[in-house]
Amino acid sequence: TLKFLMKERFWFKMISLKKEDEQSHTISIKVSNESGVLARVIGLFSGRGYNIESLNVAEIDEDSHKSRITIVTNGSIMTINQIKLQLERLIPVDTVDDLTTDGPSIEREMALIKVECNGNNREEVIRLSETYRAKIVDTSKNSFVFELTGAIDKINSFIEMMRPLGLVDISRTGLAAISRGKKE
C-alpha cells in the first residue's frame, strides 16, 4: 500500500503541476477554403478533449482560396505543441502558428452589446460608452446597441460596467489575431 500511496501522490502532484502550467494560447491556422476543413479541425480538438474558448474563421485570399482559423485554447506548452503537430498533419492545413509564443501579435475582438435603459440611467450608459469608445449602432426610446472593438479585457470590462445598468444581450465575434512585423 505504501507504493500505491506514493504513486497516487506522484500523479496528484503531476496533475497539480500541469494545471499551474496551463495558459491561454492563440493559434492561427491557415487552411484551404474547402468544405469540411473546419469540421476536421474542430474534430481534432473535441476528439482529444481540448477546449476551444474562442473561434474565428474567415476567407483571407479569394484567389488562392485560403482561410484563417483563429482558435484560443488553454494548455501547457507541451499540450499546445502537441495540438500544433496534430493540426499540421491535417491535409488542408498550410500553416499553424502559436501567436502567443511565436512573437508579438495583435489581437482584437468585436462585440455587439444591447442595453435597455430608462430616463434615469440613459445619461450614464452614454457616458460609459463614450469612455470605452463604443459606437452606438442602434437606438430606440428604451435601448441602445453598442459596437465595441478592442482587446478582450476592454470588452469584458465594458460588459461588466453595463450589467447593472440594464445589459440585455451580447454577441461576440471571437478573437481575430495576426502576427506583427515581417514574417520570417
What is each model feature region?
Residues 10-67, 72-184:
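Long, contiguous binding/interaction regions
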